[in-house]
């Protein structure tokens, strides 16, 4: 009877151990690839419209490097277009990233941004706001 209980306990431990490993994909411990799926642009009059990532100079794919605290567009000059992750927190099952980007030098196009990544699924929402404009980007992340 004791042997059966020990085998049952060992089996239970084997089942429990892998779950934190799987959940760790979207907690900031591994680099991620983010794909922008839907992009919405809103103006001060309350009108919003769906736009393509290219129409707002947004790459469709980004590498998120948590160790370097950088986000790089994939397939473009990484140093020139990278942005810094200035704040990172785990809140209510979401990894929240925040930062600010100056954009093009000499042009008043800077934005503040926040990205929320669901720890369980990797689905993500990126919001960015600037002068008289706001953007919402729906997408998904996958571990690299």
Range-by-range predicted roles:
Residues 64-70, 91-94, 114-124, 143:
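Short, solvent-exposed coil/turn segments at beta-strand boundaries
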Residues 7-18:
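Bacterial N-terminal signal peptides
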